[in-house]
């Protein structure tokens, strides 16, 4: 998969893949909590920063779990059809 090959060049991303789905999922949870905290506090810039981390880690999790953006698009289309 091209996306994973590109990501593996990044040492941090490579380490995440090495640690597996459970560790990546934990990281997604942490980033989600941090995003929510900043949103509730009204810290727009900090929320954007944390949301960026959340999206990044979610994309890594999807890849590690064998899912793709196309899978998400298909699910959303199914729900709204």
PLM region spans:
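Surface-exposed loop/turn and secondary-structure junction residues enriched for glycine/proline
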Residues: 15, 19-20, 27, 51, ...
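An amphipathic alpha-helical micro-motif enriched in hydrophobic residues
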Residues: 28-36, 44-65
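C-terminal end-helix/capping segment
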Residues: 67-81
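Alpha-helix initiation and N-capping motif
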Residues: 9-10, 69
């Amino acid at each position: 998969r091209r996306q994973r090959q590109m990501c593996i060049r990044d040492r941090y991303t490579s380490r995440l893949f090495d640690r597996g789905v459970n560790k990546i999922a934990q990281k997604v949870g942490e980033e989600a909590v941090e995003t929510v905290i900043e949103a509730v506090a009204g810290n727009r810039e900090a929320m954007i920063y944390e949301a960026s981390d959340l999206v990044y880690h979610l994309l890594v999790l999807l890849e590690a779990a064998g899912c793709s953006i196309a899978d998400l698009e298909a699910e959303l289309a199914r729900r709204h059809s």
